[in-house]
Every structure is written in C-alpha cells, then in structure tokens.
Amino acid sequence: MNTLKLKDEDIQDAFPEIWKYLEDPDVTDLDFNCGNIWQSKVSSIPTRVENAFLTESYWEKFSALVGKSVNCNFNPQEHTAMADTQTLRITCLHKSQSKSGLTNVNIRKSHGGLRISREMALENGY
C-alpha cells in the first residue's frame, strides 16, 4: 500500500464535482459506497447526497487518478490506493474487494492543527 502527498489543488482542478461537497468547513467525510454518496458533518449524522449525478465510472476515474498519483496500479492485485493532501485523506478500495461490487471511496478531512489544546482538554476533563 503506497501513500504519497498530493495537493488540494490537484483534486480541486481535476474533480470540481467532488470538491463542492467538501468546501463546507462543517463537512468531515465524503463516502461513495454501494452506489450512494454520503456526506458527514460535525453537526449532524451522515446524510445521503441527493442528485449528485456522480456515476460509478466517475469514481473509478477518480480512484485511478489517486492510484496513479501514488504509483499504485489500482487493480485486483493492488486493491487499495491511499493518498493525502494538505487537508484530505483519501482511501479507494477496488471493486473486486468490495461486497457491493462497486469501487468504494472515502475522503476524510484532516486539519493540520490541533483541535483540542492542552488547556481545553484539562478544562473539559479529557
């Protein structure tokens, strides 16, 4: 399994259709599985994205780009491709390994800074 760094701009430029679901600072995850897109936010439970018009072939193209960017063939033998940007962690699972028979993609936001300071942790009893 290879993991290399990408730039956020690489994703924004190549896949603006995905980026629009990640722009909201409240969004934490975007998942494509079983043919559905799910968006998770800090303030609510995961919700299905309606009328996204992003097909299985679109996600396969996205996964192939992620695989290529990390020097992974992304095929049944190399069935997982993982990449990081400054703010995203991307994991793609090949359809040959998926129970649904479709490519699975998870895009998780990761912030560079600490969300909880030492003082905040002590104050709240963490």
Locate the predicted segments by residue:
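N-terminal anchoring/assembly modules that precede and organize ATP-driven motor systems
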Residues: 1-50
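P-loop NTP-binding catalytic core
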Residues: 44-126
